[in-house]
Amino acid sequence: MGRTLENKQQIVGELKGLLAETELALVLDFKGLSIKEMSDLRDRLRVTNSVCKVTKNTLMRRAIDGDSSWANLDSLLTGTNAFVLVKGDVGAGVKAVRSFQNEFKKSETKGALFEGKLLSQDEIKAIADLPSREELMAQIAGAINAVATKVAVGINEVPTGMARALKQHAEGGDS
């Protein structure tokens, strides 16, 4: 028995809501993945504030219909698709998918859409190679701290150097 019209409309509404919060959409070919493997992927994505949805291409097509920012996704809507919708840290979401794919070697990325632009496989890989938000914040904090430390050492060095010069002058004057 197929889905009712109300059920399909509910799914399309849910997809529209998810897409409104999504920054990046990855389209995966999930053919050959077991339920356990899909659950593993979903668990990995949950940590990164991302979600994996398996839905019919026609329902996704209806969800993106009329939304220009998602219009380019239409070209990827063929075959068996799982849609990874990344909400927050785009790099972390893509890394989670890539680590899953490297481990199971059953799923491949068909494409991705970021800010209305279809991304190539190289661009997707480049996003995965980016440091996470936390790593970037740590690097920036470290750089700021290093500058502050150098300034503090420099400020402290002026009176210390002056004291050494005076001491040397005083010792030199006694002899």
UniProtKB/Swiss-Prot annotation:
GO CC annotation terms, alphabetical: ribonucleoprotein complex; ribosome
Gene3D superfamilies according to UniProt: 3.30.70.1730, 6.10.250.290
Ribosomal protein found in the keyword field: yes
CDD domains: Ribosomal_L10
Recorded superkingdom: Bacteria
GO MF terms held by the record: large ribosomal subunit rRNA binding
Gene Ontology biological process terms, A to Z: translation
Keyword list, A-Z: Ribonucleoprotein, Ribosomal protein, RNA-binding, rRNA-binding
HAMAP family recorded: Ribosomal_uL10
Subunit note: Part of the ribosomal stalk of the 50S ribosomal subunit. The N-terminus interacts with L11 and the large rRNA to form the base of the stalk. The C-terminus forms an elongated spine to which L12 dimers bind in a sequential fashion forming a multimeric L10(L12)X complex.
Entry's family note: Belongs to the universal ribosomal protein uL10 family.
Name of the protein: Large ribosomal subunit protein uL10
Species of origin: Synechococcus sp. (strain CC9902)
